[in-house]
Amino acid sequence: MKRFLFFMALLCIWCISFNSVKAVSNAELQDTSRFEHIVSKGDTGGGDGKYIELSTLKDVSTSGSTKSVEAKIYVVLPSSDLVREYTIHYDYNLNYSFAHLVAKVPEFKQQFPDFYLGEIWNIKMDNSGIVGTVKAQQDYTLNGESKPTKPGYKGYEYVTFLTPTDFDFESYHVANRVFKKVFGIFYDDVSR
């Protein structure tokens, strides 16, 4: 029994050494062959920003009406000496893309005679069509050293810089940019 426990402990140590966390520094994020800076309205110009790790972008779609993407996105917060890595999964309901809703205006007007184009904004505010789920997160210092990842506050575990993806908010623009990197077109330009 002791040999078995010793072997299991040795196996765990061996696995951990091969699966160690790969830290990312702020300097590495500037490598445009590996990362793309997402220029967004939330950037203050003080060195903060969001970066997509290009090699992690994956189309994981399983349905025709919903496109799904997984990626690693890094959020840099210099004032907190923090680079936060998010592994995120986005689901995009193509029936709620802006272009698709505009194409349906004649149908909406038939059902609701007072319907006008501005109502699409209200539809998008009620349901953006994008759902983002954080699958994992890891914190690093700006120099790339691992840092303990703090859990979210109770009730806010899923509120991040990237989720929820409410229409016309920062997180929505980031998700739209991720969609374009994978499919070559912005989510809101897709017409079914």
PLM regions: where:
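Positively charged n-region of N-terminal signal peptides that target proteins for export
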Residues: 1-4
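Intrinsically disordered, low-complexity regions enriched in Ser/Pro/Gly/Gln/His and often acidic
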Residues: 7-8, 114
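Bacterial N-terminal signal peptides
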Residues: 8-15
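N-terminal prepro-regions of secreted/extracellular proteins
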Residues: 10, 20-25
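N-terminal secretory-pathway/extracellular module detecting exported/lumenal segments
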Residues: 23-87, 91-192
